[in-house]
């Protein structure tokens, strides 16, 4: 058995696993619906049980359960870990029924999670199946199913992240199966921190508005300050949710808004926290007060030598087997890969199906990218 045999087996299995991809994505699994997320995970677990692979679980009361599937669990070698999240962002029914559509003529599949991130899970499952059917038994290969990634693991209080860490600490490589950007594998990602600003003003009738202090007006000033952060490679801010006021003829006493701030380095995060505190403490119109709290946080994935060395080895493997070369890439979006990198595990992100319009009702992927990404994963698992 050799790597070429496994890559050929992936081609043989590709059409069958396009069907798996379709069926998996037809099981809609918004993060907030635990039963739906668990149902989607169970679909993948059913394949593992049939193949006799080991399954460990992290049972959650609010979020979906997280799982780790292991083939070759008896091997003493260091494992390679593959990972993807089962949860998606849209409520059930947003894509119509059935949610997934395949356009063979265009070579595309459309639906919730076809790229982010169910496509990645299926490509990992395809890679593992090909390895298993070709008799590969050298090292453990793990597939970790995350359940609340889309909301930064708030609902599990980061317990799913801890589970991922515990399953991966001894890994020779952690390959996160987020959406693939053609020609690049991600080795650095921005962190995300979301702040809630709660502003209190002075309420009066709008006929006497000059005697009041509008919480909405104060929020506007604060938002203008925050939204000055628009550095593509550094700090950015988007204030995407706001609520306040009671009636049109009342000066608003209360206003709340949420700021989504992204940063590239830990030093930038420290600056963000300091500046946010200053903006919260400053009353731009006078006579208002403001409290600020952290709603959620996801750490950044900083570029480091450990991950660069892993990428270098991956490129050597790809060159050996005629797989298209990749370059180091970055992303402004958050990912659980950042946590694994933080814990010292050699990590590369975005080895997955390739497509576009992620998080929209037009999310799509190239059908051919399923086999392509599975070959990437399988070759690394064997040769790293």
Language model features with spans:
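Short glycine-aspartate micro-motif
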Residues: 79-81, 109, 172-176, 194-196
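Metal-dependent amide/peptide-bond hydrolase catalytic core
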Residues: 1-5, 12, 59, 90, ...
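Acidic/His- and Gly-rich active-site-bordering loop/insert found
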Residues: 2-112, 133-136, 316-318, 337
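Active-site metal-binding loops of divalent metal-dependent hydrolases
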Residues: 29, 86, 149, 179, ...
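Hydrophobic/aromatic beta-strand patches that form the interior of the parallel beta-sheet core
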Residues: 80-82, 144, 173-175, 346-351
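A structural signal for isolated positions on well-ordered beta-strands in alpha/beta enzyme cores
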Residues: 81, 142-144, 238, 291
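Acidic/histidine-rich catalytic neighborhood of metal-dependent amide-processing enzymes
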Residues: 117-190
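Phosphate-handling active-site elements
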Residues: 105-107, 127-142, 226-235, 384
């Amino acid at each position: 058995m050799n790597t070429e045999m496994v890559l050929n087996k992936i081609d043989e299995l590709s059409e069958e696993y396009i069907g798996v991809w379709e069926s998996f994505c037809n099981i809609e699994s918004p993060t907030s619906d635990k039963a739906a997320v668990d149902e989607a995970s169970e679909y993948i677990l059913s394949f593992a049980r049939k193949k006799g692979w080991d399954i460990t679980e992290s049972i959650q009361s609010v979020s979906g359960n997280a799982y780790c599937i292991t083939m070759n669990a008896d091997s003493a070698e260091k494992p390679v870990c593959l990972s993807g999240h089962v949860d998606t962002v849209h409520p059930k029914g947003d894509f119509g029924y059935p949610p997934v559509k395949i356009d063979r003529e265009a070579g595309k599949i459309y639906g919730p999670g076809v790229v982010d991130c169910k496509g990645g899970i299926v490509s990992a499952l395809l890679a593992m199946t090909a390895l298993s059917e070709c008799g590969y038994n050298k090292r453990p290969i793990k597939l970790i199913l995350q359940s609340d990634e889309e909301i930064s693991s708030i609902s599990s209080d980061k317990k799913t992240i801890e589970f991922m860490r515990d399953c991966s600490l001894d890994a020779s490589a952690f390959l996160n199966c987020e959406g693939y950007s053609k020609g690049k594998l991600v080795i650095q990602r921005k962190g995300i921190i979301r702040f809630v600003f709660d502003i209190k003003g002075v309420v009066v009738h709008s006929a006497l508005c000059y005697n009041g202090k509008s919480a909405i007006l104060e929020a506007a000033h604060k938002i203008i300050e925050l939204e000055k952060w628009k550095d593509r490679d550094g700090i950015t801010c988007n204030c995407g949710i706001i609520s306040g006021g009671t009636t049109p003829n009342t000066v608003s006493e209360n206003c709340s808004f949420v700021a989504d701030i992204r940063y590239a380095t830990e030093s930038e995060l420290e600056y963000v926290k300091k500046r946010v505190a200053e903006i919260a403490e400053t009353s731009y119109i006078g006579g208002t007060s403001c409290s600020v709290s952290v709603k959620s946080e996801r750490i950044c994935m900083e570029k480091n030598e450990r991950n660069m060395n892993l990428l270098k080895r991956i490129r050597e493997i790809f060159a050996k087997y005629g797989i298209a070369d990749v370059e180091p890439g970055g992303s402004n979006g958050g990912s659980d890969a950042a946590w694994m990198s933080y814990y010292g595990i050699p990590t590369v992100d975005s080895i997955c199906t390739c497509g576009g319009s992620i998080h929209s009702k037009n999310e799509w992927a190239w059908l051919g990218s399923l086999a392509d990404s599975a070959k990437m994963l399988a070759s690394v698992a064997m040769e790293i």
